[in-house]
UniProtKB/Swiss-Prot annotation:
The gene is FBN5. The lineage of its organism: Eukaryota, Viridiplantae, Streptophyta, Embryophyta, Tracheophyta. One of its GO terms (cellular component) is chloroplast. This is Fibrillin protein 5 homolog. It is found in: Plastid, Chloroplast. Keywords: Chloroplast, Plastid, Stress response, Transit peptide. It comes from Oryza sativa subsp. japonica (Rice). Essential for plastoquinone-9 (PQ-9) biosynthesis through its interaction with the solanesyl diphosphate synthase SPS2. Binds to the hydrophobic solanesyl moiety, which is generated by SPS2, in FBN5-SPS homodimeric complexes to stimulates the enzyme activity of SPS2. Residues 54-75 are annotated as: Disordered.
Length: 278
């Protein structure tokens, strides 16, 4: 046998048969034999083998360039969540249009619509432990946009809030570092040349749970004196309506909207406001 030839003996189960073209190109002759153990084998006589055409290594498929910028599932989920949250807030504002914060009453159908939207937002609360993030989420100035506090019937008449006095904005300033809250309720008296004034209620609070605070009334004043003279007779009634004392649970808060429920079963919806408006 030529020196350039090599004799190989391999068990057939471990040998993949070469193609006829490969055997012809390499000058391979094959013959079958049986070993003393009874196992069949294959003899390959290989001479100088001409190299065949090289195959290109398979490479991983590369997605189109535009595919690289497609949002990942998690990003899409976040986007969908934020969109749903925005839609719910828009729907709530639309439902509150013309309701004057609900203080002077509304139909049961409208109340049910508003409360369903409030509960929807509460179920999507992006801040599940708000008292841990009071500085970031709650500190600052807020304006009341809805409340279940109501001034109806004889109360409204006694307080002169039908025609004589108009109820203006309700602001709340929260100082987290001092654990203080100041509520400012604006009024104007038409009969007194559009006299404007306000009821200011100062309170302190203590965190009790991840969602609740206990509130203590510190003081209350009405300014100017002319407005105090109007409310003097029914001042206790007025204070009882707006007294914040008790516990308050923050059920929803983000950068622009806050919802709370108190121990008297009241609901409060507030939006971020500019302190210069107070």
């Amino acid at each position: 046998m030529a020196a350039a030839s090599v004799l190989l003996l391999l068990p057939s189960p471990f040998l993949r048969p070469s193609s006829p073209a490969h055997r012809a190109r390499c000058g391979i002759a094959t013959t079958t034999t049986t070993s003393t153990s009874g196992r069949r084998g294959l003899f390959l006589f290989a001479s100088r083998c001409r190299p065949g055409p090289r195959r290109r290594a398979a490479s991983a498929a590369v997605p189109p360039e535009h595919g690289l910028s497609q949002p990942q599932p998690q990003a899409r989920a976040v986007g969908s969540y934020e969109a749903a949250l925005g839609d719910a807030k828009d729907a709530l504002y639309a439902a509150l249009e013309g309701m004057n914060r609900g203080i002077f009453g509304m139909t049961s159908e409208k109340r049910s619509e508003i409360h369903a939207l409030v509960e929807l937002l509460e179920s999507k609360n992006p801040t599940p432990e708000p008292t841990d993030k009071l500085q970031d989420k709650v500190d600052g100035c807020w304006r009341l946009v809805y409340s279940t506090i109501s001034i109806l019937g004889k109360k409204r008449t006694k307080l002169g809030l039908r025609d004589f006095i108009s109820l203006g904005d309700f602001f709340q300033m929260i100082d987290v570092k001092e654990e203080k809250a100041v509520n400012v309720i604006k009024f104007s008296a038409r009969a007194l040349k559009i006299l404007s004034g306000q009821l200011t209620i100062e309170a302190s609070y203590k965190i009790t749970t991840k969602t609740k605070v206990d509130i203590t009334l510190d003081s209350s004043t009405i300014t100017p004196d002319q407005l105090m003279n109007i409310f003097q007779k029914n001042y206790d009634m007025l204070l009882a309506i707006f007294n914040p004392e008790g516990w308050l649970e923050i059920t929803y808060v983000d950068e622009s909207l806050r919802i709370g429920r108190d121990d008297k079963a009241n609901i409060f919806v507030l939006e971020r406001a500019d302190p210069s408006e107070v």
